[in-house]
Every structure is written in structure tokens, then in C-alpha cells.
């Protein structure tokens, strides 16, 4: 097996599985308690990843922040920002000023095309990143799940309904029930009105060769930053 970081994928969704309204708006699906939990978990990661679709749509800061708005952990302990996708990072993007860049000797966020996710993760591992937190969006989460390179998911479930086409996940490479991905729920928590479900993915699950490289289809979505 190719060495890679431990990969945690996070998303927020409504009860009917939507990550955004039909017009693309998504702030906020979950409440303050759930968002605070996300930031505490970000602080435990070495790197934080977002797709260019979400980057361009939301301009997320990708920092681990306290309720007051300040940094939850010092700059040198903040997760290093990683961007995946072919589109350029805008010059005025917030992550260009990410506090973790200078302490880690970086002048800009790390960026990968997303054409080979296994190779991307191997490179991150070689750079010393052991824990990767995936902040969004649905295209990135779906591609990583399809490539079978995710260790656990954090699903923040809001007691609300949106309907429409903007689902939390897209195609994850499963065509029939015989290929269903079984997860093990390892933790649940009530966070205000919302529910956190933490589930681990069975490392023994079969990996289809057609899924070892699953390019990301770039779209627009929310990181719930």
C-alpha cells in the first residue's frame, strides 16, 4: 500500500442529504456548536484540503479558529492549506495569507491537479503530513471516497430540509448494492440542534483498480468555513 496521511473527510448536510440550497447558498446549514466542533478538529490536523470549486465560491480561510474569531492554536500549529483542482488560486484569496504558510517555509498553499489522488496523498505523506482534514466540497469528498483513500468521515447532520440538486455527495464509484461501502459508526454527539456522526471506513474493503485514480470534477460548493 502506498503511504499516505490519515484522511478525514467532513461535510455538513440536511436530513435529506443536501449540502446547499438550489441557488448555491449554504451558510449556515449547521449551528455554532457544530461549527465550533469542526474548528477543534481542524486544529488536530497537519494539513487541510479544499477543492478549487469551493475555494472560488466561498473564499474560505481554512484556519482553526476560536469562537471569538482568533486562532484556536498558534500559527505554527495551524493545518497547512492544500488546494486540489486545475484552476488557479486567486491572488486575493484568504488562504494566500494563511498563518501556517510562513512557519512551514511556504510562500503559497500547496496545490495539486487532482488527476491522481493516490499520488497526491503520497506526496503529502513524503512532506511529513500525517493527518489530512478534507474541508470540501462535495466533488472532492466524492472523488476521495471513490478512490478508496478515506479513513473516516465526519457528518454534521442538521434537522432541516432543502431539496434540490446540491447533494452532499456525488458519484463515489458505486453502481450497485453489491459494491456498497459499509462504514462503522464510532462516535455520535449532539451539538446544539445538530448531530455529529463519526464513521470509520473498513480498511479491508475491496478496492477496484478502476478507482485508484479518480479525477475530481471541479464544481462549486461550500466548505462550511
Regions found by a protein language model. Give the residues of each.
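Active-site ligand-binding patch in enzyme domains
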Residues: 2-133, 139-142
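Intrinsic-disorder/low-complexity, polar/charged segments enriched in Ser/Thr/Lys/Arg/Asp/Glu/Gln
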Residues: 6, 152, 194-196
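Preference for bulky hydrophobic residues occupying beta-strand positions
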Residues: 9-11, 155, 199
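Structural signal for conserved beta-strand scaffold positions within catalytic alpha/beta enzyme cores
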Residues: 83, 111-113, 155, 187-190
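Conserved histidine-centered catalytic loops in small-molecule metabolism enzymes
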Residues: 117-118, 172-225
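Generic C-terminus detector
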Residues: 124-133, 142-150, 159-164, 196-199, ...
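Short, loop-centered acidic/histidine patches that primarily coordinate divalent metals
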Residues: 137, 156-159, 191
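Flexible, gly/pro- and Lys/Arg-enriched active-site loops
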Residues: 147-183
Amino acid at each position: 500500500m502506498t503511504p499516505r496521511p490519515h484522511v478525514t473527510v467532513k461535510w455538513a448536510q440536511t436530513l435529506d442529504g443536501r449540502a446547499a440550497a438550489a441557488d448555491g447558498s449554504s451558510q449556515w446549514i449547521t449551528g455554532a456548536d457544530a461549527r465550533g466542533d469542526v474548528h477543534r478538529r481542524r486544529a488536530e490536523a497537519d494539513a487541510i484540503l479544499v477543492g478549487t470549486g469551493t475555494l472560488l465560491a466561498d473564499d474560505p480561510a481554512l484556519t482553526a479558529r476560536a469562537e471569538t474569531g482568533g486562532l484556536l492554536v498558534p500559527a505554527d500549529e495551524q493545518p497547512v492549506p492544500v488546494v486540489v483542482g486545475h484552476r488557479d488560486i486567486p491572488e486575493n484569496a484568504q488562504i494566500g495569507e494563511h498563518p501556517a504558510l510562513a512557519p512551514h517555509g511556504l510562500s503559497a498553499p500547496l496545490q495539486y491537479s487532482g488527476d491522481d489522488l493516490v499520488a497526491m496523498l503520497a506526496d503529502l505523506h513524503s512532506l511529513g503530513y500525517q493527518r489530512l482534514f478534507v474541508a470540501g466540497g462535495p466533488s472532492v469528498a466524492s472523488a476521495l471516497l471513490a478512490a478508496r483513500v478515506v479513513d473516516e468521515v465526519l457528518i454534521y447532520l442538521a434537522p432541516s430540509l432543502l431539496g434540490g440538486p446540491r447533494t452532499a455527495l456525488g458519484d463515489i464509484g458505486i453502481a450497485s448494492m453489491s459494491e456498497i461501502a459499509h462504514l462503522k459508526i464510532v462516535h455520535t454527539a449532539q451539538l446544539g440542534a445538530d448531530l455529529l456522526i463519526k464513521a470509520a471506513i473498513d480498511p479491508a474493503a475491496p478496492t477496484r483498480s478502476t478507482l485508484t485514480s479518480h479525477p475530481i470534477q471541479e464544481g462549486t460548493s461550500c466548505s462550511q468555513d
